[in-house]
Amino acid sequence: MFALSGYEYLLGFLLLCSLVPALALSASKVLRPSNQGAVRRTTYESGMEPVGGAWIQFNIRYYMFALVFVIFDVETVFLYPWAVAFHKLGVLAFIEALIFIAILIVGLVYAWRKGALEWS
């Protein structure tokens, strides 16, 4: 047998990860019914008749709350592996994490002072 380095496994994994969704999407396109009637083009409202238009305006405050949520959600994603390996990383990694948290807190205070978190 051939000895594979880590790159061949990575290439195979990426190929498999690209191939499976492509096959699933092409299979669904081949197997789906092709009826494009007027009822099929209407929106589905949990079995109810649609009320109003589909294009409505949302308040910009929803966007601001979502943006702040995403920022702190990404912070959690970055800090979780750090917290798991904290005892192995040492003091320098602790200081770097504190700087990272401080930058995010400065951003939160800025958003708070600008009124991005106030619903008025």
Swiss-Prot record:
Keywords per UniProt: Membrane, NAD, NADP, Plastoquinone, Quinone, Thylakoid, Translocase, Transmembrane, Transmembrane helix, Transport
What sort of enzyme, by top EC class, is this?
Answer: translocase
Q: Where in the cell is it found?
A: Cellular thylakoid membrane
Q: Which GO terms describe its cellular component?
A: NADH dehydrogenase complex; plasma membrane-derived thylakoid membrane
Q: What is its EC number?
A: 7.1.1.-
Task: Tell me how this protein sits in the membrane.
Answer: Multi-pass membrane protein
Reaction catalysed by this chain? a plastoquinone + NADH + (n+1) H(+)(in) = a plastoquinol + NAD(+) + n H(+)(out); a plastoquinone + NADPH + (n+1) H(+)(in) = a plastoquinol + NADP(+) + n H(+)(out)
Membrane-spanning regions, if any? 10-32, 64-84, 89-109
Report any one BP term from Gene Ontology. photosynthesis, light reaction
Report whether Translocase shows up as a keyword of the record.
yes
One GO MF term on file is:
quinone binding
Role, per record: NDH-1 shuttles electrons from an unknown electron donor, via FMN and iron-sulfur (Fe-S) centers, to quinones in the respiratory and/or the photosynthetic chain. The immediate electron acceptor for the enzyme in this species is believed to be plastoquinone. Couples the redox reaction to proton translocation, and thus conserves the redox energy in a proton gradient. Cyanobacterial NDH-1 also plays a role in inorganic carbon-concentration.
Q: How does it assemble?
A: NDH-1 can be composed of about 15 different subunits; different subcomplexes with different compositions have been identified which probably have different functions.
Q: Could you say which protein family the record assigns here?
A: Belongs to the complex I subunit 3 family.
Which PANTHER family is this protein grouped with? NADH-UBIQUINONE OXIDOREDUCTASE CHAIN 3
Instruction: Note the HAMAP family from the entry.
Output: NDH1_NuoA
Question: Could you identify this protein by its name?
Answer: NAD(P)H-quinone oxidoreductase subunit 3
Traced from the root, the source organism's taxonomic lineage reads: Bacteria, Bacillati, Cyanobacteriota, Cyanophyceae, Acaryochloridales
